[in-house]
């Protein structure tokens, strides 16, 4: 088995030398200001050892990576009844597509596209005030990462709200079909805020560990979800975690993963490691360009693909 610390150091150096970095998300003004010349990586192995490279301690907006954790929470609240409100199939369309939602009568294709994540957020909000629902999401993230210092970047949340016209359209369209129960403004407020949670690579990798270990957070021994549910969340991450780039990610990386337009990717090597990478420059599908390349090299060198070494 190759030395993991050496592999991560090697990959970080390779990423620092690349000139093709993608383009930062410019439709959220606060994200457009992020320096694209950054790359960070953290891997936590089965024994709990942490290996890092590059800008692994720099906080970033996790954006759609939060959808893994809101899905986990919603499933804990309502179980498989959630799947009456959202599907489990890849979309093959941009993450904020309105056309697909219209064709499918307001039921989002999966919980990781924007419409699906808004519907999942609405489930968490039901029976709560928005502040309470958001607090529950944030505390869950802090608990998983074992770090009470994780915060919501209010500036990013406000920036998303000011420019979130497409998400508002998606939410209103779902509301017209009865998929959204709560006031649209309340649901979107919680959604924009949980996407604006700020974490670094080390924190994000720690938060994802339960998905690498049959639903158990090995740091605490706490069972977050059942082994079956962990496998199913990983399956949705593999098939739907990178929007219309999910097939390419599965082909090249071969791990369950979830990306965010802030440039981060959480990837899971079941039984082996939880991995977080971050580089703000995105590819055409809205996924971290260097993040995907780094993960491809990591799985190749460590033999971690779920499809075989």
From Swiss-Prot:
Gene3D superfamilies according to UniProt: DD-peptidase/beta-lactamase superfamily
**GO aspect biological process, one term:** glutamine catabolic process
Q: Which residues bind substrate?
A: 64, 114, 160, 167, 191, 243, 261
Keywords of this entry:
Hydrolase
SUPFAM superfamilies, A to Z: beta-lactamase/transpeptidase-like
Task: Specify the enzyme's EC class, one word.
Answer: hydrolase
Disulphide bridges: none
Q: What is its EC number?
A: 3.5.1.2
Q: What is annotated about its quaternary structure and interactions? A: Homotetramer.
- Family as reported in the entry's similarity comment: Belongs to the glutaminase family.
Instruction: Spell out the protein name for this chain.
Output: Glutaminase
- Give the organism, scientific name: Methylobacterium radiotolerans (strain ATCC 27329 / DSM 1819 / JCM 2831 / NBRC 15690 / NCIMB 10815 / 0-1)
């Amino acid at each position: 088995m190759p030395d993991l610390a050496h592999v991560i150091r090697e990959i970080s150096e390779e990423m620092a030398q690349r000139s093709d970095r993608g383009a930062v998300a410019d439709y959220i003004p606060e994200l457009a200001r992020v320096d694209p010349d950054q790359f960070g990586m953290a891997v936590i192995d089965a024994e709990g050892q942490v290996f890092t490279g590059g800008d692994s301690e720099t906080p970033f907006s996790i954006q759609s990576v939060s959808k893994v954790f809101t899905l986990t929470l919603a499933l804990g609240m309502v179980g498989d009844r959630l799947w009456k409100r959202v599907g489990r199939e890849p979309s093959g369309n941009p993450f904020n597509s309105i056309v697909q939602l219209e064709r499918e009568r307001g039921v989002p294709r999966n919980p990781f596209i924007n419409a699906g994540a808004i519907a999942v957020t609405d489930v968490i909000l039901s029976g709560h005030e928005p502040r309470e629902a958001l607090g529950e999401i944030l505390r869950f993230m802090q608990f998983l990462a074992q770090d009470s210092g994780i915060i919501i970047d209010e500036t990013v949340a406000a920036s998303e709200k000011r420019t979130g016209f497409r998400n508002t359209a998606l939410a209103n369209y779902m509301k017209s079909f009865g998929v959204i129960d709560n006031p649209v403004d309340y649901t979107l407020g919680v959604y924009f805020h949980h996407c604006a949670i700020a974490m670094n690579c080390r924190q994000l990798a720690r938060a994802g560990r339960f998905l690498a270990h049959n639903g158990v957070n090995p740091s605490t021994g706490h069972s977050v979800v059942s082994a079956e549910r962990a496998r199913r969340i990983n399956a949705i991450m593999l098939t739907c975690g990178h929007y219309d780039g999910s097939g390419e990610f599965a082909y090249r990386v071969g791990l369950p993963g979830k990306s965010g337009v802030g440039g981060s990717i959480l990837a899971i090597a079941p039984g082996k490691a939880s991995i977080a990478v971050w580089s703000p420059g995105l590819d055409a599908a809205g996924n971290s360009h260097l993040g995907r390349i780094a993960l491809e090299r990591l799985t190749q060198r460590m033999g971690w693909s779920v499809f075989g070494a």
